[in-house]
Amino acid sequence: SAQGLANYVKSQVPKNVPLACAIAYDTRHRSVQFSRLCAEVMVAAGFKVFYLQGFRSTPELSFAVRAKHCSCGIMVTASHNPPSDNAVKAYWSTGGQLLPPHDQGVIDEVMSVDTINRTDFDQAVAERQIEFCQTEIDREFIAAVGKLATPGPRELKIVYSPLHGVGTTAVCPVLEQAGFTDVEVFALHAKPDGDFPNVPGNVSNPENPRVFDSMVEHARHVDADIAVATDPDCDRIGCSAPLTMAQDSEWDTLSGNQIGALLADHVLETRQQAGSLSAENFIVTTLVTTQLIRRIADSYGVRTIGDLLVGFKWIAGAIDEFGA
């Protein structure tokens, strides 16, 4: 896969433009080894590699591609799939995943690879063809995401679970940057572990309400206001919260559409109150998004770019086309 990506990118980038690739990995089995292998292949193909050493999130990898002006990026992960799986997510220079025609172009190159070239990882580091950039990117990523925080109460007690994934490298520092100081990492899910041992069915999908059973029990015990979880590569979120303000309230795990509707309304409301909502702003929805979000956007006079195919890459494409 790495060789095919390298071959395709080289065919698309002008000869006088330096080649660069950002690489990160999650907590799955052999993710470290696969990321090093990808780095060796990319260096041998003539790319400078910006390598995030240590478990990092998919959003941070996407950020690194743009921050380092890379030609492409590689995230070694299988998202919230079972423990037996691992794979790569490929990113274009925009920081988004591959869109047509590039996605098919890379697949065609992968299928036609007959030779895989590698440069020894340690040798490439010594020759500065691989640069460890995690400290710099961590700082810039956390600051950039923290600036997106909207006004509102910060006196919340949050129980957070990375579901044995990378989330503590992204969620916790971003929450702290945004002013949320009472955050407890749920101990049962805190350890990075590709077996996802303490998650129901060993599948770390925060959209599965069963994931929250033990979290909610603990959250109620410590009188938390909300329980939040992210998948292994930290690009998917779920949450559970009490139905009322009563101390003995039942808790409910929100669906993706419920979370999306609440976030859309909150962001639009706070931007309107700040006087920063304009006709240039828009909401993006996909084929599986509730129509409630379109109605919320309409109520604020904001257009909706809707019914995109499912996947972050299509949303990123809309941002590139219409502006953020």
What do these predicted regions represent?
Residues 74, 79, 86-107, 237-269:
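Glycine-rich phosphate-binding loop of actin/hexokinase-like ATP-binding domains
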Residues 53, 111-136, 243-324:
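Proline/glycine-rich low-complexity loops and linkers
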Residues 15-21, 42-48, 151-157, 223, ...:
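Short, surface-exposed connector motifs at secondary-structure boundaries
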Residues 1-38, 125, 131-156, 166:
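An N-terminal, well-structured beta->alpha segment
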Residues 37-45, 68-69, 89-97, 173-181, ...:
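A glycine- and small-aliphatic-rich helix-loop capping segment at beta-alpha/alpha-beta transitions
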Residues 32-37, 62-66, 84-90, 111, ...:
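Short acidic, glycine/serine/threonine-rich loops at helix termini
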Residues 86-219:
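Gly/Ser/Thr-enriched, mixed-charge loops and adjacent short helices
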Residues 14-85, 179-238:
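N-terminal small/polar loop signature for handling phosphorylated ligands or for N-terminal nucleophile
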